[in-house]
A protein has these predicted regions:
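Contiguous, function-dense segments enriched for cysteine-driven chemistry
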Residues: 54, 108-110
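Inward-facing hydrophobic residues that define packing positions of alpha-helical scaffold repeats
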Residues: 5-8, 12, 45, 82-83, ...
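A positional/architectural concept
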Residues: 1, 8-9, 16-19
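Solenoid-repeat scaffolds in large eukaryotic assemblies
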Residues: 4-8, 41, 78, 111
Length: 137
């Protein structure tokens, strides 16, 4: 495992600030999550955001980072990470995750507003998910 992490670090260094570096870091984070090593996944995702020069990749990494932080009970950090989601294509997913985090924090009104925003901007499946979450409040 340490050898693979060293190879990833070497690759990222060789491909600094490129999409290749972001993709390998996203893949590394996925592996850590599969092993339930959320702290390492968080580090990989933070590196991916730092390496990214693209709003879509930054948004994807920030969504995943927020989910990992949420998993670890870092609710404020998870909400802060969602502020890095800039791509409009991810706005409903951002709002759905924000609502889940707000519920965990006990902020039902904030969650309601987030789910209502997701209903406005989401695709049909996201809108249905937002409605289901609103019904459960």
């Amino acid at each position: 495992a340490a050898e693979q992490q060293a190879k990833v670090a070497e690759f990222v260094k060789a491909h600094d600030k490129t999409s290749y570096a972001v993709f390998i870091l996203l893949d590394e984070a996925k592996g850590f999550v599969a092993k339930q090593d959320y702290a390492s996944a968080e580090n990989s995702l933070k590196q991916a955001i730092a390496q990214s020069q693209d709003d879509i990749l930054t948004s994807l990494a920030a969504l995943r980072l927020s989910a990992v932080q949420f998993q670890q009970g870092q609710f404020d950090a998870a909400l802060a990470s969602l502020n890095q989601v800039k791509s409009q294509g991810f706005s409903a997913r951002k709002d759905l995750l924000a609502g889940d985090i707000q519920i965990a924090k006990g902020d039902v009104n904030g969650a309601k507003a987030s789910f209502e925003n997701a209903q406005k901007s989401g695709n049909p499946l996201e809108k249905q998910m937002a409605q289901m979450k609103l019904n459960n409040l």
